[in-house]
Amino acid sequence: MSTLRESAYWQELWRERLPLSAAALGTGFSISLNMFIASVFVPAMQAEFGWTGAQISIAGSFGLIGLFTFPLAGRLADRFGSRRVMLGGVAAIPGCYLLYSFQSGALWQYYSIQALWSLFAVLWSATVLGRIAAGRLTLARGFGIALLLSAPAAIGAIAAPLLSELIDSEGWRNGYRALAAVSLGAGVIAAAFLPSQESAHATPLDQRPDREAMRAIFRSRAFRILASAMLLCNFGTIITGLQFAPMLLNRGTDPARVGGYLSAYAIAVIVGRFTIGLSLDRFSTRYVAALGMGLPALGFALIAGAEAATWAMLAGVALLGISQGAEGDIAGYVGAQFLGPGLFSTTFGLITATTSLAGFIGSVASGIVLNEGGGFGPFLAFLAVTTATGAALFLLLPRTPHSRSTNAPADT
């Protein structure tokens, strides 16, 4: 990047500092925050109600509702703007936190709230707010998307220990009530400072009929490549989620070292998010995407063949983390780059649904392999192959559009 372009890059970020800060605050307290804090409440509720881990795990199946709600939320954001749609989530998420605090121990109450969460919390998500960075930034689009997607992890790192202390001293019900109050306040502040559609550099709304917009997306060669690649690259979501620690133990890792590996993974996620975001702004989209999403293939292979507590194991975990951080940047950037910022949220919602479907398929596949007694080794080898194949698909993307600010689809 030339000196002149580099200067314009940072000037653009400075110009959009208030909208980006508001969007980052909003994304930080959005639905994504829950993945970093939800488990803090579980032990206390189990102790009071006698719920088993299996009973709580069933609630995770409600996440499949997101296959339908994320694309819908994205389409609403593209039609009516991020702020209007987000306000629905600002009511829903604190409301669900408050409802959790009034549970009496009946599982149907817990499941009902989880269902409400899956239906309405998506209105306050990166799918809705990401279009602010995608549309208001042209030179620094990758960095802006990375900034928004990193906010939940940063806030979660602060909130989780504070909530844990509050639960220990005041009980889990007051923990949920405090969380409801803080998230409501953050949501209102973020919404107040989000730019209006009449402001300068506003992301254009997509006013065409929904059927026409969907037809444009699915006819796009870039979208078909992106969706196929993300599907293949995300079968391993279960490994970097619920099965991460069990997988490390299965590969012979000392239990005392598991925490260290998880910390290394978390650091790698943040590094990957900003590294890939900056790279997307400077280098060819297809090559950056192929490299960023291809790293886990090597990571899975290293872990599958590594012995316990080796540098190969640590390197494999780090590669998984870097790619996990890169995933959202790549999905958002490719969608905005080839379909235009006006369709960012619809496209991002569809890709989020695709990755959720991939995670579900991967969970079923891993269960079959583990039930056969093969351990994680064969499944890791399978993931290495599918991930490498998915990453290679990014090389088929059309050449990057000459104009980074175009709002019209760049390919057919």
Q: Residue ranges of each PLM-predicted region?
A:
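Helix-loop-helix hairpin linking two adjacent transmembrane segments in secondary transporters
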Residues: A151-P195
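Extracytoplasmic
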Residues: P19-G53, A73, A159-A160, T240-A245
